[in-house]
Design a protein with these regions (language model features):
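A cross-family phosphate/adenosyl-ligand binding-site feature
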Residues: 1-119, 124-213, 217-397
Length: 397
């Protein structure tokens, strides 16, 4: 993931400094050449030896340690870096950089680099919400510096609020976006549905399908990577949501229909990756149906709304993408669906094939277009396919 990338991690003297050890370890495991700069206060919380062992490189603290041979050290690291990650970023380092202060190894190196800098603030809630800190963050954002928002929860100061060090996956996602994103969908509003709807029979049982939601989440991540404004309408709560994505949770087809229509007019791209139940029970019991009371059970069903069909009828400027999970005549059924539902693009796959379809991490797909052209792809991970789908959408906008 970070092969051949030179990553400089700045560790400041916040209580979350120990969590940076996990970040450094992950980055190295994923192929990164990781170099650590610690402030003197950070060394009072975690020893430089820890970060040296985890990174496989010398750790810099002192301005004049001459670790990097003949080169002026802060310039050597500044020139080496493909990306800087300041984690945890304290109010002190944010204030220094925002106001041009370079008085230690970390602040001096940040000032000297032309690489992208990603701040990961972590501090007491009152400090984070202090107007001066907020002003400094806004100033840095305006200057092109990037931030990962801290999380809310229980803090080391025994209070609850915003300021917790974020999950490593969120930091790594933002690093990927900065390093590999091409801004293909910058400024575009993309709405993606994911997962399988559930139609209640009673409070315990439901009619559903085998969709895990992984494909929709992979597409959402790929769209966010390309700087889209992503809204993910999700029928599942079991998957982690990538950073920077607005998620709306729904359960059944009617709720999904309401949400998709709510965001439709303001969207540039709609991708219907959710697996929607065609039918729902006419009557839903408000209590668990006991088998002792029913020797047999007949459930009368009625049609759910055809969400994709209705979105196709409403289409104006939107680029509309659908999915077709089939077990035979996949291409023919896909071509028919494009015409019937007024789609611009459709991802078709044979869910009967091993390694394709529901509840697996891979997929085998064909991408069909309204002009009659198509592209077929071999078995790949859903994340890889998600990137391809977003690239193809961007090409045709």
């Amino acid at each position: 993931m970070f092969k051949n990338k030179h990553i400089v991690v700045g560790i400041c003297g916040g209580i979350a400094a120990f969590k940076a050890a996990g970040l450094v370890s992950r980055l190295r495991q994923q192929g990164g050449d990781v170099h650590c700069i610690m402030t003197k206060n950070a060394t009072k919380l975690v020893t430089p030896i820890t970060f040296g062992e985890l990174s496989g490189n010398n750790v810099t603290v002192d301005m004049f340690s001459n670790i990097y041979k003949w080169d002026v050290e802060h310039i050597a690291l500044a020139n080496l870096a493909d990306i800087f990650v300041i984690a945890p970023a304290t109010a002190d380092i944010i204030g220094k950089v925002a106001n041009g202060i370079a008085d230690d190894m970390l602040s001096t190196t940040i000032m000297a680099t032309k690489a992208k800098v990603l701040f990961v603030p972590s501090m007491n809630t009152n400090m984070y919400e202090n107007p001066i800190v907020c002003q400094n963050i806004r100033k840095l954002r305006d200057l092109g510096y990037e931030f990962v928002e801290p999380e809310s929860g229980h803090l080391a100061c025994n209070t609850n609020g915003k300021g917790r060090f974020p999950e490593l996956d969120k930091i790594i996602f933002q690093m990927q976006r900065i390093l590999y994103g091409r801004h293909l969908l910058k400024g575009k509003n993309v709405v993606i549905s994911a997962g399988g709807t559930k139609e209640n029979i009673d409070p315990v049982r439901y009619i559903g399908n085998r969709s895990s939601g992984r494909m929709g989440y992979a597409i959402a991540k790929a769209a966010a990577m390309e700087d889209a404004n992503v809204t993910l309408v999700s029928c599942t709560k079991s998957l982690p949501v990538p950073d920077g994505i607005n998620v709306v949770y729904v359960e059944n087809a009617r709720e999904l229909n309401t949400s998709m229509n709510l965001y439709y007019d303001s969207s540039d791209v709609i991708i219907m990756a959710a697996a929607v139940a065609d039918y729902r029970p006419v009557n839903q019991s408000d209590h668990k149906i006991k088998k002792e009371e029913n020797s047999s059970l007949d459930i009368k069903l009625e049609l759910n709304p055809d969400i994709l069909l209705e979105l196709g009828k409403r289409k104006k400027k939107q680029f509309l993408v659908g999915f077709a999970a089939e077990t035979n005549a996949v291409i023919r059924h896909g071509q028919e669906k494009i015409k019937k539902k007024n789609l611009d693009m459709l991802i078709a796959n044979d869910v009967a094939m091993p390694g394709a379809g529901f509840n697996v991490t891979t997929n085998i797909a064909s991408i069909l277009y309204k002009d009659g052209t198509m592209q077929q792809y071999p078995k790949m991970t859903k994340e890889e396919l998600g990137k391809i789908i977003i690239e193809k959408v961007a090409e045709r906008l």
